[in-house]
């Protein structure tokens, strides 16, 4: 960690506790700042708040008194708190500096940064980059929106390590000096408009990722969205990824991932399924090549990386049949992606909490579905859907029973896909629990040698 002195004896107000606020407050205190934490929720019984108070950090909770701004503090804002909250709105009017916890991670570390943002795919890209580093002798520490507080991880990395940071649009607002060596924008679609108010504001938040980059840095982005992503502020060397055509960067041609005319890997050897994941893979591969990760480590990762837990996660193969856990697919859009990810015959496990909706919008994506095993409150609806399309339908009591019933109908090379298109709460406390039950049952049917 750098001995950063820019906040010594400065008044700093951390607005919003949670994990990032807690770690930011501790770091700021360590850097010599006079720290106050404010949260609109009552924190009188909160363990983290009590821990901060034991360090001499003032905690004000239950409301946002504007008197906290009277000593003109620097604001460190939790990314989840919108600028419309009274104390932040007033701080803007007073011209106070407002930073994010991610900005702190940059100020205290000399480690080069690979920063990943985008509407879709950023968690997959970040995780895949982390896995490629893990397969090499280099160190890439995951941080940010992926679940590891950036300012905490930044204190632990060496200058020779990489910080691999997933950034939401919320975290990118408030960037002042933050400068990744390699920035990735996976894509930009309409999202979070309740926070950003309009699409232009959302797009501009994403573009903050490259505003401090120089000609020595890299921006990796989707070639087919370059008009949306690029702006006059862009100074970094821009490289593209495309699954459709040759570009200055990385692309797919004749079934191979290609960089600078060199074939990296046949796409048939990739474990991570889905057309949408090809773009994620290209972005991750290009970033790791630029960071010096050996091609062998990249290939090792691509032939073993099975995705994020419960997101079209490759679970394993039993004989000739691959099993995929997509328990996080709690709506029809997510299941559309899943069903569209395979060319082989699919045995589709679906059903769950009944929220009153129908599922006819899935019909165009059911071409490769050979059979359906339905469960949960919506099993009658899914049975009706399957029968209307001439699919073989079996009813099951729950996910575990569904996996058992699969064994009676499975044929060579069938893909077994759990993609419920429904929330789990009718039978399971979380989608994670539902996914774990699927995995447990899959393992129970593996042959013992």
Curated annotation (Swiss-Prot):
Gene Ontology terms: biological process: cell division; cell wall organization; peptidoglycan biosynthetic process; regulation of cell shape
Taxonomic path: Bacteria, Bacillati, Bacillota, Bacilli, Bacillales
One GO cellular component term: cytoplasm
HAMAP family the UniProt entry points to: MurD (MF_00639)
Gene source species: Staphylococcus aureus (strain MSSA476)
Protein name, as recorded: UDP-N-acetylmuramoylalanine--D-glutamate ligase
Record-stated family: Belongs to the MurCDEF family.
Role according to the record: Cell wall formation. Catalyzes the addition of glutamate to the nucleotide precursor UDP-N-acetylmuramoyl-L-alanine (UMA).
A Pfam family this chain is assigned to: Mur_ligase_M
Gene name per UniProt: murD
């Amino acid at each position: 960690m750098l001995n950063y002195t820019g906040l010594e004896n400065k008044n700093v107000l951390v607005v919003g506790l949670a994990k990032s606020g807690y770690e930011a407050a501790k770091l700021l205190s360590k850097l010599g700042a006079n720290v106050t934490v404010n949260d609109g929720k009552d924190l009188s019984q909160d363990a983290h708040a009590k821990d901060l108070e034991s360090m001499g950090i003032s905690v004000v909770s239950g409301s946002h008194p504007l008197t906290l701004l009277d000593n003109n503090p620097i604001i460190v804002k939790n990314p989840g708190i919108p600028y419309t909250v009274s104390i932040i709105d007033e701080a803007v009017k007073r011209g106070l500096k407002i930073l994010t916890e991610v900005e702190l991670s940059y100020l205290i570390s000399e480690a080069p940064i690979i920063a990943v943002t985008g509407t879709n795919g950023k968690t997959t890209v970040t995780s895949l980059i982390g896995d490629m580093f893990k397969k090499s002798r280099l160190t890439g520490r995951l941080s940010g929106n992926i679940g590891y507080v950036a300012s905490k991880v930044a204190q632990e990395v060496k200058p020779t390590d990489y910080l691999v940071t997933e950034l939401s649009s919320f975290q990118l607002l408030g960037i002042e000096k933050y400068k990744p060596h390699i920035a990735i924008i996976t894509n930009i679609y309409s999202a979070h408009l309740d926070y950003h108010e309009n699409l232009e504001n959302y797009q501009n938040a994403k573009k903050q990722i490259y505003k401090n980059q120089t000609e020595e840095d890299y921006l990796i982005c989707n070639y087919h969205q370059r008009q949306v992503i690029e702006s006059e502020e862009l100074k970094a060397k821009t490289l593209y990824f495309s699954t459709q055509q040759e570009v200055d960067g990385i692309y797919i041609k004749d079934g191979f991932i290609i960089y600078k005319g060199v074939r990296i890997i046949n796409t048939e050897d990739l474990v991570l399924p889905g057309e949408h994941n090809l773009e994620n893979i290209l972005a991750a591969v290009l970033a790791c090549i630029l960071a010096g990760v050996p091609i062998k480590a990249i290939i090792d990762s691509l032939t073993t990386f099975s995705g994020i837990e419960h997101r079209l996660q490759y679970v394993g193969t039993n004989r000739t049949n691959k099993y995929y856990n997509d328990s996080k697919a709690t709506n029809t859009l997510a299941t559309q992606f899943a069903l569209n990810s395979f060319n082989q015959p699919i045995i589709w496990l679906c059903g769950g909490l009944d929220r009153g909706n129908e599922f006819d919008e899935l019909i165009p994506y059911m071409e490769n579905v050979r059979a359906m095993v339905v469960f949960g409150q919506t099993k009658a609806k899914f049975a009706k859907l399957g029968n209307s399309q001439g699919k073989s339908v079996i009813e099951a009591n729950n996910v575990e029973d569904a996996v058992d019933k699969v064994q009676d109908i499975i044929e060579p090379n069938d893909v077994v896909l759990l993609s419920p298109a429904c929330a789990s709460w009718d039978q399971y406390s979380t989608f994670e629990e539902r996914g774990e039950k699927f995995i447990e049952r899959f393992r129970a049917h593996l042959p013992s040698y």
